[in-house]
């Protein structure tokens, strides 16, 4: 359904009608396993839901009597999971088997990738947008060759960008072939 005021409600109702049994199973799984969190249909697009509801930049936990800061990480079954990199969360997309394995508490393994720094300088001009920066960075990183690398953004230009704008950079990681496009933790995240 589209083009009407109640299109969202109609589409969500249709989703429940078509996938009710699956949603019942997922609801059970969320209660049965501590590492499974289910976001209901209609809550939004996955990579935006990750930022708004799931990802925590840092979690405090007491370990051996000391409070420790633990940076968050997130695996998603969507290539644009990397959007969370803009809020300083270490995350990327994986296949269904890897994602299911991780949800059940098993570790995933990967080769340690090369890390490529991308230094941003200057500020956005009045006629420029964060998307312009992301598209320019995408072209430059493609030309450099960063397939399966971690890209870390840095520099004074990054300092000028909001977390929302950094999320645009992270979201483009699949377009330049990197595993992720990470913005480090700072006062904006």
Predicted regions and their residues:
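Fe-S-dependent hydro-lyases/dehydratases of central metabolism
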Residues: 1-189
């Amino acid at each position: 359904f589209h083009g009407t005021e109640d299109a969202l409600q109609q589409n969500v109702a249709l989703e429940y009608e078509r996938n009710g049994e699956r949603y019942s199973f997922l609801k059970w799984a969320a209660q049965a396993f501590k590492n499974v969190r289910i976001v209901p249909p209609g809550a939004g697009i996955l990579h935006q839901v990750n930022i708004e509801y799931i990802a925590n930049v840092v979690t405090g936990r007491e370990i051996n009597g000391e409070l420790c800061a633990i940076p968050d990480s997130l695996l998603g079954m969507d290539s644009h999971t990397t959007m969370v990199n803009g809020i300083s969360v270490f995350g990327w997309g994986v296949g269904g088997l890897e994602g299911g394995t991780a949800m059940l508490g098993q570790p995933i393994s990967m080769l340690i990738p090369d890390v490529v720094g991308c230094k941003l300088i200057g500020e956005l001009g009045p006629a420029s947008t964060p998307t312009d920066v992301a598209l320019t960075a995408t072209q430059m990183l493609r030309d450099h060759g960063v397939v399966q690398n971690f890209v870390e953004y840095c520099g004074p230009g990054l300092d000028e960008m909001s977390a929302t704008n950094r999320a645009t950079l992270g979201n483009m990681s699949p377009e330049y072939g990197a595993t992720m496009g990470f913005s480090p933790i700072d006062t904006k995240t």
